[in-house]
Amino acid sequence: MDSSTLITRLETAKTSFQSLERQLADPDVAADPKLLESIARERARLEPLVLDFEALQHVEQEWQETKQLLRESRGDDAMESLAQEELQQLEARKTVLVRRLTLALLPSDPRDQRSVMLEIRAGAGGNEACLWAGDLARMYERYGQRIGWSVQPLSATEADLGGFRELILSIKGDAVFSQLKFEAGVHRVQRVPATESQGRVHTSTATVAVMPEADAVEVQIDPSELEISTARSGGAGGQNVNKVETAVDLLHKPTGIRVFCTQQRSQLQNRERAMEILRAKLLERQIAEANARESSTRRAQVGTGDRSEKIRTYNYKDNRTTDHRLGRNFSLEPVLTGQLEELIGACIAEEQRHQLEELSHQEED
């Protein structure tokens, strides 16, 4: 991004920030909690950008003043040396600020701030794949706890020998999708199963899909396109089990997407959850179709959300996690206990690098 474009966009952001501050002082806005929350959230998003822009302007002013001092100090070796040293420090600070501001202005996914539904499906590997799906679920639950997110099961199909054939987690919090979107794809594990008597390493897989939450306005569903049936649930226990039909089986006929929800205590709650899951799945389908229409350059980026892409291998014998998109290894144990900050941070940095490259090519054209 050239300097003139950067400054223009920063000036626009600063003007927007000042407008939002004026709106927050408006009594009419204060009387509307929903509007107030929306404006406050947008102001909070812009504030770090505006503060960095003001810091850059201050550095620019100091640089000009120091440059003038250098011109006036010709012949005074000590003063010239001090001025040169100050200029180097200011240029280093300017470089850091410009890069940070450029990254902050890169195009962002409008869905980044949303909560998500995270679906884990056992893949190749039979019972071991189901156990692996359960291990992945615990990994994401622990990461959510570390971050301060709310993690709740929405739908689960348990396997006979432990683990899950399929599990959907609701993960709510700030900017959940911006981080977890990098987890979509095939996760492969290489380890000796507990049931393996010969000590042989087995390879199993599980597929993760990360679906940003969708509201009823964004994804509209025609009730006539739904086929809904109920069943007895083995859910909460007590007299409810096998006596009341609380489970909901929902089929979206145009797409063939099926959602079976049993986690809630009432049929109404399970139906609401099933509709939430269906909307998220339909939105994910729309996103996948949009990604398929984009250029190969865009698809080569890290956060494409393609659930068929093999993204990571977890090797127990070597205590190693390999992210194939990054070409990097990470220690296995911290990752499995939910310490995903370094790994996800590396994915974000790689995506930003791709975006900067693409921006550079566009400017050259």
Curated annotation (Swiss-Prot):
Keyword Acyltransferase among UniProt keywords: no
One Gene Ontology CC term in the entry: cytoplasm
Subcellular location per the Swiss-Prot or TrEMBL entry: Cytoplasm
SUPFAM superfamilies: Release factor
Residue list for modification N5-methylglutamine: 239
Keywords assigned by UniProt, alphabetized: Cytoplasm, Methylation, Protein biosynthesis
Superkingdom to which the source organism belongs: Bacteria
PTM comment text: Methylated by PrmC. Methylation increases the termination efficiency of RF1.
ATP-binding as UniProt keyword: no
Any matching Pfam family: PCRF
Cross-referenced InterPro entries: PCRF (IPR005139), Pep_chain_release_fac_I (IPR000352), Pep_chain_release_fac_I_sf (IPR045853), Prokaryotic/Mito_RF (IPR050057), RF-1 (IPR004373)
GO molecular function annotations of the record: translation release factor activity, codon specific
Annotated HAMAP family: Rel_fac_1
Family: Belongs to the prokaryotic/mitochondrial release factor family.
Known function: Peptide chain release factor 1 directs the termination of translation in response to the peptide chain termination codons UAG and UAA.
UniProt name for this protein: Peptide chain release factor 1
Record organism: Prochlorococcus marinus (strain MIT 9313)
